[in-house]
Amino acid sequence: MDSVMIARRLGAGGLIAVAAVHVNWARGSAWPASDMQTLAQAVIGRNRMPGAVPCLSVSALLMLGALFVSGFPQHPPKLQRAGALGVVVTLALRGMIGASGRMPHDRASRTFAYWNRRLYSPLCIALAALCAAGLVLPGDETEFS
């Protein structure tokens, strides 16, 4: 397996894992927190979690992103590349803005700020890098040519 395929699979796998967590939250789970209020403070900086529809919407977008990044199923090459590039740009911007401490959450909890700096932003940057590597590393270019 070449480096391009490894990067694509790792990036897509990360997106799928995050999508699964959002589905879990849509079903009412407070994992990994002890209760919903603690979870909400940690993941969005508020006292209440969004409902199932917003959580499932985020999950669906993450899954779509994983399809673009993985190269499966085969989309028209320009659509595939544009979709994967959109994933990279979105994740990179989210990661950089979060890491800079300039997230537009003026009322966000300290718990969110803590986890945003230590987990969410670095995770977004790492996923962006993996997804970008799948676009730019030399390898089998047949999927995106």
Where are these regions (language model features)?
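Short amphipathic, positively biased membrane-proximal segments
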Residues: M1-S145
